[in-house]
Amino acid sequence: MKYLIDLHTHTIVSGHAYTTLLENIKQASQIGIKILGTSEHGPKMPGAPHIWYFGNMNKVPRKIYDVTVLRGCEADILNSNGDLDIPERIQNELDYIIASLHDVCIEPGTIEDNTKALLNAMNNPNIDILGHTGNPMYPIDIDAVVSKAKEKNVLIEINNGSLSGSREGSYDNCKKIAQACKKKGVKVILGTDSHISFTIGNFDKVQKLLDSVDMPKELIMNTDEKKIVEYLKAKGKLKNFNLE
């Protein structure tokens, strides 16, 4: 299956990644990625950019090397209330937001604690994607999270980085999450979670997992540029944007 979109990518701006935005975009262009989202970590992550960085993202051109560039963020969920480390004013300016749990920003809790954080985060209409939900450090009630994602029209990310060793033990959780999404008709988005340009667009591990559960193509958001743009527009994003 051909994937045209990668929305979970990082640059040197995040403090622990190794290539620039232009290097990421150039790599995307060379391998046929049509839409690249840049999603730096929110400011509570050590080494992450100042909040002004996110407020200034409109300076990034929409088209570079014939790749459409979306301006996003991987925001940190800070507590069981689902609060993010990005102010609402800035949230409203971004093209999309991935919301994730990171242990340097929120202590791993019980299944109930972790699930509550994700469920409450999804009450924020600015959140579009839940990031790396298969992380075994944060066990969750998968059925409850996937059901809430369907209710709130939030995409569930299946993270290739998690399956490539960055979060050991994620495979079984990710497979269960994928199966739950298939059963409930919840859309998923594949993310590379790239911290270097060479992994942009590489969904090899996720592809094998999705094949193993026979995931319907219509539930995968990375296959069609129009599908992801229409999804974000329906949520009030990309107001003055049109695919060329």
From Swiss-Prot:
Xref: Pfam families: PHP (PF02811)
SUPFAM superfamilies the record matches: PHP domain-like (SSF89550)
Protein's name according to its UniProt entry: Probable phosphatase CA_C0509
Chain positions recorded as Zn(2+) 2 binding sites: H16, H41, H195
UniProt binding sites for Zn(2+) 3: E74, H102, H132
Enzyme nomenclature, EC number: 3.1.3.-
Cofactor: Zn(2+)
Cofactor remark: Binds 3 Zn(2+) ions per subunit.
GO CC terms of this entry: cytosol
Keyword tags: Hydrolase, Metal-binding, Zinc
Source organism (scientific name): Clostridium acetobutylicum (strain ATCC 824 / DSM 792 / JCM 1419 / IAM 19013 / LMG 5710 / NBRC 13948 / NRRL B-527 / VKM B-1787 / 2291 / W)
Spans through the membrane: none
Annotated NCBIfam families: PRK09248.1 (NF006702)
Family: Belongs to the PHP family.
Bridged cysteine pairs (disulfide): none
Cited Gene3D superfamilies: Metal-dependent hydrolases (3.20.20.140)
Residues involved in Zn(2+) 1 binding: H8, H10, E74, D193
Span of the signal peptide: none
